[in-house]
Amino acid sequence: MPIHGAPRKLLGSLNSTPTATPKLGLAANHTGAPCLEVSIPDGLFLSLGLVSLVENVLVVAAIAKNRNLHSPMYCFICCLALSDLLVSGSNMLEMAVVLLLEGGALATRASVVQQLHNTIDVLTCSSMLCSLCFLGAIAVDRHISIFYALRYHSIMTLPRAQRVIAAIWVASILSSTLFITYYDHAAVLLCLVVFFLAMLVLMAVLYVHMLARACQHAQGITRLHKRQPPAHQGFGLRGAATLTILLGIFFLCWGPFFLHLKLVVFCPQHLTCSCIFKNFKVFLTLIICNTIIDPLIYAFRSQELRRTLKEVLLCSW
């Protein structure tokens, strides 16, 4: 995304600026004050993107192959994998183009590069928005399955889930086009930040509510079988730990990127903020890491999906 302070604009590569040496150290801002700058090696960035790409392709292939997985829940998981695939793929594509331009292996007009840059940015932004939306959709789906278990199949029908999925993709593409077109307006960046916070609050409220219901259910079973209280307490601790990990990973991987957007609006010239801007590639790397972790949390925990995945891998050999 063409954000102030982000060293990713393709047009900047036409100047043949040498790539920074990978390091973790102090860099100076425009006033000479020291800044902590973490430089991510291009090879590491591309390797993480490739891992995410392969992992999410396998999830999509497994769900597409097994008709038993063609349920609303797995449709949302499949779309999450597809959007994560696009997040990693678009970032890898832009990084590859930047490296080719810097190395002189790709020579083209500045207008063509700018058009390619805008196209990739729309793809990146829309896939990021889709990824966040489908994380929220999965949380809503699980909440309905727990609190409206008897009516779940009448509430969350496959056609209804397909309409929700189509609406998310269309809204994300349209929104990302507007965001990229008007990226220099503060209101646009603030909308993205508010959207992230809304998804974080939605997921936190729904998962905490589900954890509370699960603890009540476990407590009822404990009373029914006259077991000792520690069994229920242990369940609550495990559930709280799982919830903390789930929300913690989401916040740690996505939070720095949206903090960057917020700082672009409120303190673009501040010394501390300018130091944070130097680590933009780190924030993108964290998002790539999230696209690697998502299948582990939402997809690979399913025994049916793992079995299908083995079949897909065996068929490919």
Swiss-Prot record:
Glycans are attached at N29. One of its GO terms (molecular function) is melanocyte-stimulating hormone receptor activity. GO terms for cellular component: plasma membrane. One of its GO terms (biological process) is adenylate cyclase-activating G protein-coupled receptor signaling pathway. The chain crosses the membrane at residues 38-63, 73-93, 119-140, 164-183, 192-211, 241-266, 280-300. Its main location: membrane. SMART domains: 7TM_GPCR_Srsx. PROSITE patterns: G_PROTEIN_RECEP_F1_1, G_PROTEIN_RECEP_F1_2. It holds the Pfam family 7tm_1. It is a multi-pass membrane protein. A lipid is attached at C315 (S-palmitoyl cysteine). Residues 1-37, 94-118, 184-191, 267-279 are extracellular. Gene3D superfamilies: Rhodopsin 7-helix transmembrane proteins (1.20.1070.10). It is found in: Cell membrane. The keyword Transmembrane applies. PANTHER family: G-PROTEIN COUPLED RECEPTOR. Receptor for MSH (alpha, beta and gamma) and ACTH. The activity of this receptor is mediated by G proteins which activate adenylate cyclase. Mediates melanogenesis, the production of eumelanin (black/brown) and phaeomelanin (red/yellow), via regulation of cAMP signaling in melanocytes. Interacts with MGRN1, but does not undergo MGRN1-mediated ubiquitination; this interaction competes with GNAS-binding and thus inhibits agonist-induced cAMP production. Interacts with OPN3; the interaction results in a decrease in MC1R-mediated cAMP signaling and ultimately a decrease in melanin production in melanocytes. Belongs to the G-protein coupled receptor 1 family. This is Melanocyte-stimulating hormone receptor.
